[in-house]
Amino acid sequence: MKKLLFFVFLSFFTLSSAQVRNEIHIPDIMGYKTLKCDFHMHTVFSDGLVWPTVRVSEAYAEGLDAIAITDHIEYRPHKSDMPGASHNRSFELAEASAKASGILLIRGSEITRAMAPGHSNALFLSDCNALDVPAWQ
């Protein structure tokens, strides 16, 4: 009896911890596929508080189809905890999780300059490290 109760208890907690996806239903426009996306996310490699794979899990749970992790180039408050970390690292860590979850992952970064061009996101990059320059001119 104890084994049966243990099995039922274990099954309940195992099944209840499975990630549930909140499906968002937005109709497609004829000839196009509608995607639910978030193109501005931060991780611990910037001023976020979670690991890149957690952002992918959140996106899946929220019903998103595509995300861009756009960690800051200039502002990295956790830099001393991850010395030498590449600006591409968050994408690299999230890539396998995104693929397994069916989430389209876009490589990007956030550029924050004191003067024009100011504050913007760069998406579809091949190398985020190329943006890490002292002057934008």
Predicted regions and their residues:
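Short, intrinsically disordered low-complexity segments
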Residues: M1-K2, V20
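Sec-dependent N-terminal signal peptides
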Residues: K3-F13
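Boundary at the C-terminal end of the N-terminal hydrophobic targeting segment
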Residues: S16-A18
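A metal-dependent hydrolase metal-coordination microenvironment
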Residues: N22-Q137
